[in-house]
């Protein structure tokens, strides 16, 4: 077995490639030779600020949580995987004993260990261990790159399930970053009849048109919320059944509440502003449901199946690739907003 190298974050804008021990596995775990790892918005937040949500970097930590690789060792109690299996890593290790875990809502576990948080190391390294039942075999026709990129897709499929998207749904997605684009691709696969994406950056909207949007709206900063609502309704020909906030800003959430049709639904999947002022009364009086979505809940297998069947062309979502020793450059590019999905090939 070769040496293990990892991308280790020491603080804001301080990522280093370091040699770390190859981990010893427990009976219920597998050791994975990582092939590639995707860069996510939360990785960028950690890299840029040294914090993400409740996590504060007060000691060095391996980053990365969108990984795929090959099993090279299995624990004594593992029967579902064998050496040589190619797997996508669902980056959580729930406690399995809290009330929410027992109800199947393991994404809301009260004491989870999640990759690249202060509870668990990330997988942007050459060798990584993980609990076997959260490692999913890749279909034969999927690449390792698609296996890594399935992680954000699984997040989005859970979100779209929460949004109750069905055949014929009319959708507006506010924010054409990676999550917004994947929402469009997933909603299209679920049968949405018309999908509009909005953003303040034209290049993102151009990508959205290639990857599932029927129409797009460039939102200029001087537009009022009411002007954005009016333009969405004009493009859609109606008010949307479902409005998805995929950026997390108060302006997007206000527009979502105002534009959604009576008895429709607003899904908030992006979280950026901690406190926002919202026109809730108008939405509640029209029985507009407002729901959130957090991480992944039983959607890795559907995500893998959707990519394997061709329903979601995930390969088109991947735009940039870097070797492990260029992790800083990859994070800087992701920070600039000029890339859709960046993958790091850790064995290079």
Swiss-Prot record:
Cofactor: Zn(2+)
GO annotation terms (biological process): sorbitol catabolic process
GO molecular function, one term: D-xylulose reductase activity
Binding locations of substrate: 295
EC number, as in UniProt: 1.1.1.-, 1.1.1.14, 1.1.1.9
Record-linked Gene3D superfamilies: Medium-chain alcohol dehydrogenases, catalytic domain, NAD(P)-binding Rossmann-like Domain
SMART domains: PKS_ER
Key words, A-Z: Metal-binding, NAD, Oxidoreductase, Stress response, Zinc
Catalytic activity: xylitol + NAD(+) = D-xylulose + NADH + H(+); L-iditol + NAD(+) = keto-L-sorbose + NADH + H(+); keto-D-fructose + NADH + H(+) = D-sorbitol + NAD(+)
CC cofactor note: Binds 1 zinc ion per subunit.
Coiled-coil features, chain-numbered ranges: none
Family annotation (Pfam families): ADH_N, ADH_zinc_N
Superkingdom of origin: Eukaryota
Broad enzyme group: oxidoreductase
Induction (free text): By cold.
Binding site for NAD(+): 179, 199, 204, 269-271, 293-295
Function statement: Polyol dehydrogenase that catalyzes the reversible NAD(+)-dependent oxidation of various sugar alcohols. Is active with xylitol, L-iditol and D-sorbitol (D-glucitol) as substrates, leading to the C2-oxidized products D-xylulose, L-sorbose and D-fructose, respectively. Is a key enzyme in the polyol pathway that interconverts glucose and fructose via sorbitol, which constitutes an important alternate route for glucose metabolism.
Name of the featured protein: Sorbitol dehydrogenase
Organism of provenance: Bombyx mori (Silk moth)
Organism placement in taxonomy: Eukaryota, Metazoa, Ecdysozoa, Arthropoda, Hexapoda
Gene (UniProt): SDH
């Amino acid at each position: 077995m070769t040496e293990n190298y990892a991308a280790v974050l020491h603080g804001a804008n301080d990522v280093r490639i370091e040699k770390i021990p190859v981990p010893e596995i427990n009976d219920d775990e597998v050791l994975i030779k990582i092939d590639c790892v995707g860069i996510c918005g939360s990785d960028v937040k950690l890299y840029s600020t040294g914090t993400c949500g409740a996590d504060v970097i007060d000691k060095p930590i391996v980053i990365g949580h969108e990984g795929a690789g090959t099993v090279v060792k299995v624990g004594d109690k593992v029967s579902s995987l064998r050496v040589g299996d190619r797997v996508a890593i669902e980056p959580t290790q729930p406690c399995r004993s809290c009330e929410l875990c027992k109800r199947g809502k393991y994404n809301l576990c009260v004491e989870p260990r999640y990759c690249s948080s202060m509870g668990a190391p990330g997988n942007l390294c050459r060798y990584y261990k993980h609990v076997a039942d959260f490692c999913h075999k890749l279909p034969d026709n999927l690449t390792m790159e698609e296996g890594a990129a399935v992680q954000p897709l699984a997040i989005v499929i859970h979100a779209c399930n929460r949004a109750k998207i069905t055949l014929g749904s009319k959708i507006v997605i506010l924010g054409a970053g990676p999550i917004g684009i994947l929402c469009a691709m997933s909603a299209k696969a679920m049968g949405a009849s018309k999908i509009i994406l909005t953003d303040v950056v034209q290049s993102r909207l151009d990508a959205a048109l290639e990857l599932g949007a029927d129409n797009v709206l460039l939102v200029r900063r001087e537009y009022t919320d009411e002007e954005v609502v009016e333009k969405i309704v004009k493009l859609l020909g109606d008010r949307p059944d479902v409005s998805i906030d995929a950026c997390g800003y108060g302006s997007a959430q206000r527009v979502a509440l105002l534009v959604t049709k009576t008895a429709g639904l607003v899904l908030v999947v992006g979280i950026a502003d901690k406190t926002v002022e919202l026109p809730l009364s108008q939405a509640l009086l029209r029985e507009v449901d407002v729901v959130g979505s957090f991480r992944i809940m039983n959607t890795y297998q559907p995500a893998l199946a959707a990519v394997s069947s061709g329903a979601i062309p995930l390969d088109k979502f991947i735009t940039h690739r870097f070797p492990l020793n260029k992790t800083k450059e990859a994070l800087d590019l992701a920070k600039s907003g000029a890339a859709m999905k960046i993958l790091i090939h850790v064995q290079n």
